[in-house]
Design a protein with these regions (language model features):
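Bacterial N-terminal signal peptides that target proteins for export
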Residues: 2-10
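A beta-strand-loop signature enriched in Asp, Gly, Thr, and Trp
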Residues: 232-246
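Bacterial N-terminal signal peptides
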Residues: 10-18
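Transmembrane beta-barrel domains of Gram-negative outer membranes and organellar outer membranes
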Residues: 23-194, 199-219, 223-226, 242, ...
Length: 249
């Protein structure tokens, strides 16, 4: 008999709302988060997962909302905009060794009014603004003269629109240790607007977790493979990238 649960996550505030009835062992794993840097948010990025499986035939549904303020300013480029992410998905523990996941993620440009909050945070802790206070607030602006890129006023447009699937095989699992290997397929297609385009990517990752008392340690090493060497307005991007992550609960 399949058992279902819903796992909402609001990543913008690092706030997790679990159902307490499933708090035993490692049913939740690490807080789910997706990289929000300009290049990573529009491509496949491996993220931290539990090395343990769910109980057989469990189905876990999840959803998240993330808001981000992008600011990067050098002599070569300037990025100043907001992006927002909505994500839904579900995992199914098909058997004791196999898990399958389906995920949809939408990233779009919209005014989330973070500029003022960010400047206040920098002032509070004595962090320099790096020019943020010299330009208008709430802009949507990307300039990279080296690559003939100049985009302004793209508020309301889709930045990424992707569907991905993930299959995981349980290599080892006992009371303390969990080791699993997973592979991902990722397809992104933006039909129109400034960020129009499509890309197909693949990923593989090794997940290891260790339980000790009420705590858990999580780690991940992964690789992403791309047929295209461009991302985000056709900017150069590596065909293959590696990622490592660790966490404690």
């Amino acid at each position: 008999m399949k058992k279902n649960r819903w796992q909402p996550t609001i990543l913008a505030f690092a706030f997790w709302l679990p159902a307490s009835t499933f708090a035993s062992n490692d049913l939740y794993g690490p807080l789910r988060s997706y990289a929000q840097s300009p290049m990573q948010v529009v491509s496949h990025t491996n993220h931290l997962r539990s090395g343990f499986s769910l109980p057989s035939e469990y189905i876990e549904a999840y959803g998240s909302a993330t808001i981000a303020s992008v600011w990067a300013h050098t002599d070569e480029y300037a990025l100043d905009y907001y992006h927002n992410q909505l994500e839904i998905g579900a995992k199914w523990q098909v058997s004791s060794q196999w898990q399958w996941e389906l995920n949809y993620r939408w990233v779009f440009a919209a005014d989330n009014h973070l500029d003022g909050l960010t400047e206040s945070f920098h002032d509070l802790f004595g962090i320099g603004q790096n020019g943020r206070d010299k330009v208008d607030k709430n802009r949507f602006y990307i300039s990279m003269p080296q690559y003939d890129v100049l985009e302004d006023g793209f508020e309301g447009q889709t930045i990424a629109n992707n569907l991905s699937t993930y299959v995981q095989y349980q290599i080892l699992q006992n009371e303390r240790h969990g080791l699993s290997l997973g592979g991902s397929l990722y397809y992104n297609k933006v039909a129109h607007g400034t960020f129009k385009g499509s890309n197909f990517e693949q990923g593989v990752q090794l997940n290891y977790s260790y339980l000790y008392g009420a705590h858990a340690f999580y780690s991940m090493f992964g690789m992403t493979f791309r047929s295209d060497d461009r991302a985000l307005l056709d900017l150069p991007y590596r065909h293959n990238t590696a990622a490592m992550a660790g966490g404690d609960r």
